[in-house]
Amino acid sequence: MSKLTIAIDAMGGDVGPHIPILAALKSLQLHPNLHIIIVGNRTQLLPVLKKYQLSEHARLSLIHTDNEISMEVNPVYALRHRSDSSMHIALKLVSQGKVDACVSAGNTGALMLLAKQALKTLPGISRPALISSLPNMHLGHTYMLDLGANLQCDSHTLFNFAVMGSVLCEKVDQINSPRVSILNVGKEKNKGGDVLQHCAELLKQTKHINYAGFVEANELFTCRSNIIVTDGFSGNIALKSCEGMGRVFSEQLDKAINSSLYSKLLGKLLRPILKKQLKHLHPDMYNGASLIGLRGIVVKSHGSANEIAFTCAIEHAIQETQWQIPASISKKLETVLSERDDLSHE
């Protein structure tokens, strides 16, 4: 197995550095070829590393910096005045080729701006996109992008999202010709504005993309599409609505189970079954949104992620490294754009 090296911004999230360190420990145990560089404040990190016997680990090292980017910092300010932050240093390690990927639970806006500056976009890509997977009752999961990096998109940007999502699905999930759909207010061909209509036409004309039509928001978890394409505004709202409904469902279920002695006894019997059946719906299993379209691999973890969730984010970074996702996207995009040029000259 070839060596893999991941940089982790340990100062990003909402819950302190112990979560990324615990996740790093788990990932090192799972992958004997993995090396991890933790970036952050030595004073805060060393006690945690020593607690979990990681301070002398042969495959883990620490880069010290006093500075971090909080969730409240304006992204533009972070770009101009936080060049020595843990997030920026982790991204620089990727751009310098010293690590294969970067994982951060920090400020999303700052991460996107800093990553675009440090790594640049791939040829033919004007805007990177956030992509993550959602649980799907038929397929196991479905990828959706964009999830908030680009609030407004033209048809060509959405088209590029479809190409990038297809490559990720083809490589990571080993699916030939994955089905691509566009999120819309209806499934009918005439629904949606000019941007969606034009994007649909572009996808129909591209033989290297398996376009499957429009999909509505109520089908996110049941559709037969492997990739759902949308602008960042709609994608972010859809994602957070799903997360909110999941929390409501969980809270109401606990409330119902604890409402009486009978329900508590019944709940004790049903809980193991429910836990097993609903495990694939747990948001921790889907943590880790990749910022694709860049010349390097960057994975954004949820700010409040626990150990399991952050480990999943690291796993995403490992998979994308193993499948060389940026290079694969660049190759596919070159083929698709060449095909479009040929069509325009016919």
From Swiss-Prot:
Gene3D superfamilies hit by this protein: Isopropylmalate Dehydrogenase
GO cellular component: cytoplasm
Superkingdom of the organism of origin: Bacteria
Enzyme Commission number, as recorded: 2.3.1.274
Any one GO MF annotation of this record: phosphate:acyl-[acyl carrier protein] acyltransferase activity
Keywords: Cytoplasm, Lipid biosynthesis, Lipid metabolism, Phospholipid biosynthesis, Phospholipid metabolism, Transferase
Cross-referenced InterPro entries: FA_synthesis, Phospholipid_synth_PlsX-like
Entry's localization field: Cytoplasm
Pathway: Lipid metabolism; phospholipid metabolism
Lipid metabolism among keywords: yes
Group of enzyme by EC: transferase
Principal place of residence: cytoplasm
GO biological process, one term: phospholipid biosynthetic process
Catalytic function, reaction form: a fatty acyl-[ACP] + phosphate = an acyl phosphate + holo-[ACP]
Subunit details: Homodimer. Probably interacts with PlsY.
Annotated family: Belongs to the PlsX family.
Protein name: Phosphate acyltransferase
Gene source species: Psychromonas ingrahamii (strain DSM 17664 / CCUG 51855 / 37)
Recorded name of the encoding gene: plsX
